Design a protein with these regions (language model features):
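Catalytic cores of nucleic-acid endonucleases
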Residues: 184, 208-252
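Accessory nucleic acid-recognition modules appended to NTPase machines
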Residues: 38-39, 43-201
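Anionic group-transfer/hydrolysis microenvironments
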Residues: 12, 129, 149, 194, ...
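Short amphipathic alpha-helical segments and helix-helix/interface helices
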Residues: 25, 171, 219-223
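Conserved beta3 VAIK motif of the Hanks protein kinase fold
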Residues: 204
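Short secondary-structure boundary/capping segments
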Residues: 3, 17-19, 26-27, 134-135, ...
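Single conserved hydrophobic/aromatic residue that forms the stacking wall/gate
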Residues: 1-13
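Amphipathic alpha-helical "lid/sensor" segments that cap RecA-like P-loop NTPase cores
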Residues: 15-55
């Protein structure tokens, strides 16, 4: 690694070449991690495979199993959820959005659809935990895609929110490492993830890139926590921004080196 002195403070820049790793990471962001797709010869074949997988899951695992006739409504609810990964969930808001688009669907039906998507392993949820109140909150949980490739096939919006994609990746990675993952509420701020595994507990904030304004928010929220559990900020930045005992990790480093 290389150390630089900037305005009286020392910063660490990781000295490494990530050409191949960055290409693989970009590929994963776009096409996800279903094993079969790695054996396909080109991007067109991968896209076709993911389309076919989506159709099989929606038609066989959801529509036929639960006797759903309103195919358009089902698909639109799923697309809306995947356009809004990492955002607080409200069935009432989704129902209102669908109604405004000329599609009659009740809040209860939205909730049923969400249960079906979880059952089919299209979506995973993270409950919200009030850190000061020490209680799980019964509403506004968050949902994440079980695979980003499948998510990118289904979503409607062309806007790419890298912050939310990174958040989704970190959520999946911590689940794969055996952690229970919750979203933390701290007064009017949020901790992206509280992770538990046995007696272990740690906190994580996730960002795509950390601007000076972002740095205060991402690190500041963690600095407000009055305990000694490990705290991490994960982003794509190559500059090590660790401060006050809070560890900054580059996202590729984080994925390659648990």
């Amino acid at each position: 690694e290389i150390r630089l002195s900037l305005v009286g403070s020392e910063m660490c820049i990781r000295d490494r070449t990530y050409t191949s790793d960055e290409k693989l990471f970009a590929d994963y962001l776009k096409y996800g991690g279903f094993p079969q797709r790695f054996f396909l010869p080109d991007e067109h074949s991968i896209a076709t495979y993911l389309d076919d997988l989506y159709e099989a899951i929606v038609v066989r695992d959801v529509m036929l199993r639960h006797g759903i006739r309103e195919q358009t409504a089902l698909r639109n609810v799923l697309a809306f959820l995947l356009d809004n990964i990492g955002n607080p969930f409200s069935a009432r808001n989704i129902s209102g959005r669908m109604v405004s688009e000329g599609m009659k669907i009740s809040t209860a039906t939205v909730l049923n659809y969400v249960d079906y998507f979880k059952e089919a392993f299209i979506l995973l949820n993270a409950s919200r935990y009030d850190i000061k109140g020490k209680a799980l909150l019964s509403s506004t949980e968050k949902y994440y895609a079980v695979d980003l490739g499948l998510r990118n096939v289904i979503k409607k919006s062309e806007k790419l929110d890298s912050n939310k994609l990174y958040e989704n990746i970190v959520y999946l990675e911590m689940r794969s490492r055996g952690y229970e993952v919750q979203v933390g509420k701290l007064d009017d701020t949020e901790i992206d993830f509280i992770c538990y595994r046995g007696n272990e507990k740690l906190y994580i904030q996730v960002a795509y890139l950390i601007t000076p304004a972002d740095e205060e928010r991402e690190f500041g929220n963690l600095e407000r926590l009055n305990d000694n559990y490990p705290k991490y900020v994960i982003s794509s930045d190559l500059v090590d921004l660790s401060r006050n005992g809070i560890i900054h990790r580059n996202i590729i480093d984080f994925l390659l080196n648990p």
